[in-house]
């Protein structure tokens, strides 16, 4: 799966695949291929969300409060 997709692009592709599968007129082999691709997109989205959660935890700090920003060398 292309990891360079943005979260929004991956969700859009996933929604498109789900829509195709929900129509119910997809041949079995094609449906399996769509399902596999959808699972990969789902995993990619999950990884991106976890990454954002980790970034937010760093930004907010352990107590959930916004940490003050200090520029490099600005240790006053």
Swiss-Prot record:
Alphabetical UniProt keywords: Cytoplasm, Exonuclease, Hydrolase, Nuclease
Biological process annotations from GO: DNA catabolic process
Highest taxon, organism lineage: Bacteria
A GO CC annotation given for this chain: cytosol
Single GO MF descriptor: exodeoxyribonuclease VII activity
EC assignment: 3.1.11.6
Subcellular localization: Cytoplasm
Gene3D superfamilies named among the record's database cross-references: Exonuclease VII, small subunit (1.10.287.1040)
Pfam families in the record: Exonuc_VII_S (PF02609)
Root EC class: hydrolase
InterPro entries, A to Z: Exonuc_VII_S (IPR003761), Exonuc_VII_ssu_sf (IPR037004)
Record field: catalytic activity: Exonucleolytic cleavage in either 5'- to 3'- or 3'- to 5'-direction to yield nucleoside 5'-phosphates
Role: Bidirectionally degrades single-stranded DNA into large acid-insoluble oligonucleotides, which are then degraded further into small acid-soluble oligonucleotides.
PANTHER family: EXODEOXYRIBONUCLEASE 7 SMALL SUBUNIT
Protein family (similarity comment): Belongs to the XseB family.
Subunit relationships: Heterooligomer composed of large and small subunits.
The protein's name: Exodeoxyribonuclease 7 small subunit
Gene behind this protein: xseB
């Amino acid at each position: 799966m292309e990891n360079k997709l943005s979260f929004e692009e991956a969700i859009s592709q996933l929604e498109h695949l789900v829509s195709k599968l929900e129509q119910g007129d997809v041949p079995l082999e094609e449906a399996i291929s769509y399902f596999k691709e959808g699972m990969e997109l789902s995993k990619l989205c999950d990884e991106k969300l976890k990454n954002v959660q980790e970034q937010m935890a760093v930004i907010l700090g352990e107590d959930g409060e916004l940490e003050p920003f200090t520029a490099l060398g600005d240790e006053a």
